[in-house]
């Protein structure tokens, strides 16, 4: 039994919206709920806003700020660019659902391209920011130290790539119907 073209368009649109919701929830979990911490173990906490190392002298974590991070070899500009990339990706991803809904309701290719542009920029920013941050702090990290925040950002990046491919393969439907509001 063949699925009609209308249902196929609606199913692909719903799948795309579900993927967008998953990306937003994964990025919100990692960057807001986990406060950007990629490693949060008892003797080490490293994230976009936390850099705490275990001090044997005092027997607890000692957190460092920008002046001390420069002494440790982490440039202030590099850390700021990594933060901008990762948190900017979340901000751009938040703006994706509205153009998608408008493109679906109005059958407008321009709004669809705007959503694809937001997703593409979000994907590039997330990959660049996360890579830069890992490059800057890798001498204190091990692969086994990376926690759920890191895993959710990696999964969000993979879903962003899948989402971009899906949006290119399933563009908005043709302008055949006159009453657009009933199709939303």
Swiss-Prot record:
**Regions of this protein lying in the Extracellular compartment:** 34-83, 139-149
Keywords, comma-separated and alphabetical: Glycoprotein, Membrane, Transmembrane, Transmembrane helix
An annotated GO cellular component of this protein is:
membrane
Q: Which residue spans belong to the Cytoplasmic compartment?
A: 1-12, 105-117, 171-184
Q: Where in the cell is it found?
A: Membrane
Residues modified by glycosylation? 37
Q: What residue intervals traverse the membrane?
A: 13-33, 84-104, 118-138, 150-170
Per the record, membrane topology reads: Multi-pass membrane protein
PANTHER family (alphabetical): TRANSMEMBRANE PROTEIN 140
Protein name, UniProt field: Transmembrane protein 140
Q: Which organism is it from?
A: Rattus norvegicus (Rat)
């Amino acid at each position: 039994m063949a699925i009609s073209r209308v249902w196929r368009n609606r199913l692909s649109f719903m799948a795309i919206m579900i993927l967008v919701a998953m990306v937003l929830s994964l990025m919100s979990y990692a960057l807001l709920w986990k406060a950007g911490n990629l490693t949060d173990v008892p003797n080490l906490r490293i994230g976009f806003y936390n850099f705490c190392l275990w001090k044997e002298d005092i027997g607890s974590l000692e957190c460092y700020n920008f002046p001390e991070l420069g002494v440790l070899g982490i440039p202030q500009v590099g850390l700021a660019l990594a933060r901008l990339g990762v948190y900017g990706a979340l901000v751009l991803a938040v703006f994706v659902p509205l153009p998608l809904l408008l493109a679906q309701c109005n059958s407008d290719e321009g709004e669809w391209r705007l959503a694809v542009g937001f997703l593409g920029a979000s994907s590039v920013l997330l990959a660049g920011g996360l890579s830069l941050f890992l490059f800057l702090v890798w001498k204190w990290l091990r692969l086994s130290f990376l926690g759920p925040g890191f895993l959710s950002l990696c999964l969000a990046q993979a879903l962003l790539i899948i989402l971009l491919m899906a949006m290119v393969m399933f563009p908005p439907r043709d302008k055949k119907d006159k009453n657009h509001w009933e199709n939303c």
